[in-house]
């Protein structure tokens, strides 16, 4: 849970400040500015994969052999990367105009950390703490809850416990956020460069 959340949080925070931190280079040389967001995502992905190397011996030590559920891992990593990058497309543009956006993102991530199943299973929330009629709303409003659960299930071999409809809505919303963020970034990047 913590490694997945860290991947998401660092991708989003560093993506938010990527244009501002590279303003000198951006103003001198033109190349696609999305590269700055993607480079942060790629760097954090490498860090996540290197951190996972430590997890593998621990899994064997505790008798957790890989199952077919391990296929959730690449899907969850891809979706977390898309979600973080999509949000970073929005926040990086806003950061060029509103310099406190980085701090707003940091506070939002701290709140999201406690609202997401980082240190606990999703069952602990959905099994009584949240009324059944609000469980779907919780999963729709917090895609990271689904993705953290997918990562956990990938390594523990437990069933996902999220129905296909909720999973489809969460994945669709992530793809939509990514596409809208990308379009917003493309439309506003020239104006953002002037704000640097």
Description of each model-found segment:
Residues 14-29, 49-58, 109-126:
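Hydrophobic alpha-helical transmembrane segments
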Residues 22, 38-42, 101-104, 108, ...:
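Hydrophobic alpha-helical segments of integral membrane proteins
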Residues 33, 39-108, 161-183:
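Alpha-helical transmembrane segments and their short interhelical loops
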Residues 4-9, 38-39, 68-76, 134-137:
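Short alpha-helical transmembrane interface motifs in multi-pass membrane proteins
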Residues 114-159, 163-168:
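Short hydrophobic, aromatic-rich alpha-helical segments embedded in or entering the lipid bilayer
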Residues 7-33, 38-45:
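Transmembrane helix boundary and interhelical loop/hinge segments in multi-pass membrane proteins
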């Amino acid at each position: 849970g913590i490694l997945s959340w860290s991947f998401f949080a660092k991708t989003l925070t560093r993506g938010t400040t990527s244009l501002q931190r590279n303003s000198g280079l951006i103003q001198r040389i033109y190349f696609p500015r999305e590269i700055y967001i993607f480079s942060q995502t790629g760097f954090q992905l490498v860090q996540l994969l290197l951190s996972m190397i430590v997890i593998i011996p621990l899994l064997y030590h505790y008798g957790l052999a890989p199952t077919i559920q391990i296929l959730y891992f690449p899907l969850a990593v891809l979706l977390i990367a898309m979600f973080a990058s999509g949000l970073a497309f929005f926040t990086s543009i806003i950061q060029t105009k509103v310099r406190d956006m980085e701090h707003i993102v940091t506070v939002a991530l701290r709140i999201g950390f406690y609202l997401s199943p980082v240190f606990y299973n999703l069952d602990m929330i959905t099994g009584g703490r949240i009324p059944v009629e609000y469980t779907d709303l919780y999963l729709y409003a917090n895609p990271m809850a689904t993705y953290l659960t997918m990562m956990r299930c990938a390594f523990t071999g437990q069933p996902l416990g999220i129905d296909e409809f909720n999973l489809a809505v969460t994945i669709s919303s992530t793809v939509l956020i990514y596409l809208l963020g990308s379009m917003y970034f493309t439309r506003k990047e020239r104006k953002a460069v002037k704000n640097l």
